[in-house]
């Protein structure tokens, strides 16, 4: 009997170890001017009904973060909902539906817009009012393309933004979401230097117990998001050995990605190119390239055994 209980306990632990939570990222609500980042009230309710009917648990971002931080299990039925920018449409259109379902949120604030009371955005008074229903994080001061900023301007943006965030909210932000989803190691390092504990990307994918808290993937949530496909995504632990950043000469001569998966092949995709089947040796993919990169931002992904790892390369004009 003891052996059976031990075996069952091991099985349950193994299942949780392989589980994947999912973070969804919203922007605008009932705002047809911007279809690529908008979701209608009707569509939002349909998606929330799907979570409810399929037994998903919508949890605070902090619950997922603390589980990863403390080495605790991550559940396959966990869903986290984040809202970027702090548009007024969330306050007026989205929030009532979140409250109707009792779903918590994590709001990432574009500080300059809220502090200066830009017309399309929530004020800090409104953010403080709704804070009791969710969590509030940081989305930069000026919502700039951060990779394109020199060191001084990058640090100034963090210092100004975090200072004004703290002045208005009464605490320093724990979370940070990259503007436009664009980043490199330089931006990431400056964020960490300024006390950021958790960084959210816009690399569509899942989150597992061994995810990096400084690079949590999020799934874009808009009218066209197909929930069954999004919720089926699995996290692939991978080390992107080459290239580390956008190459200075605009050319990727070689790609090397290392995973822990015991697999002989996978599928690699890159912006502007067709998905290709690739070989893996001892969990490593090595791929030669000849063509130069013809755009300032490219997204790459490797899928192995149904799990996906994603990396974005953004041209840094300040790279030495």
Give the location of each predicted region.
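Terminal accessory/targeting
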Residues: 1-77, 96-106, 111-117, 121-122, ...
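A general structural signal for short secondary-structure junctions and capping/turn motifs
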Residues: 2, 205-208
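Metal-dependent polysaccharide deacetylase catalytic core of the NodB/CE4 family, i.e.
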Residues: 21-38, 54, 69-79, 87-89, ...
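A structural signal for short, well-ordered beta-strand segments and their strand-loop junctions
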Residues: 58-60, 177, 200
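Acidic, His- and aromatic-enriched active-site or binding-groove loops in soluble protein domains
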Residues: 83, 196-205
């Amino acid at each position: 009997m003891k052996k059976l209980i031990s075996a069952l306990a091991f099985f349950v632990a193994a299942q949780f170890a392989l589980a994947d939570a999912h973070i969804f990222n919203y922007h605008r609500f009932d705002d047809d001017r911007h279809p690529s980042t908008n979701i209608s009230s009707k569509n939002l309710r349909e998606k929330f009904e799907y979570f409810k009917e399929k037994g998903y648990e919508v949890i605070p971002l902090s619950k997922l973060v603390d589980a990863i931080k403390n080495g605790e299990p991550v559940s396959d039925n966990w869903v986290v909902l984040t809202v970027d920018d702090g548009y007024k449409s969330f306050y007026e259109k989205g929030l009532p539906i979140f409250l109707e379902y009792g779903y918590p949120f994590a709001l990432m604030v574009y500080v300059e817009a809220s502090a200066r009371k830009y017309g399309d955005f929530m004020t800090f008074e409104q953010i403080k009012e709704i804070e009791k229903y969710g969590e509030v994080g940081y989305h930069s001061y000026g919502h700039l393309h951060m990779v394109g900023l020199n060191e001084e301007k990058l640090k100034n943006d963090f210092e100004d933004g975090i200072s004004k965030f703290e002045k208005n909210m009464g605490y320093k932000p724990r979370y940070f979401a990259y503007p436009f989803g664009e980043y490199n190691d330089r931006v990431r390092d400056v964020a960490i230097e300024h006390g950021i504990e958790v960084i959210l990307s816009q690399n569509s994918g899942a989150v597992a117990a061994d995810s990096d808290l400084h690079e949590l993937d999020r799934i874009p949530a808009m009218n066209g998001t197909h929930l069954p496909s999004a919720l089926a995504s699995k996290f692939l632990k991978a080390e992107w050995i080459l290239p580390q950043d956008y190459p200075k000469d605009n050319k990727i001569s070689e790609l090397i990605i290392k995973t822990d998966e015991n697999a002989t092949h996978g599928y690699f995709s890159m912006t502007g190119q067709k998905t290709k089947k690739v070989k893996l040796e001892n969990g490593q993919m090595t791929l030669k390239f000849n063509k130069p990169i013809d755009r300032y931002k490219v997204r790459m992904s490797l899928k192995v055994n149904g799990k996906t790892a994603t990396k974005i390369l953004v041209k840094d004009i300040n790279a030495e």
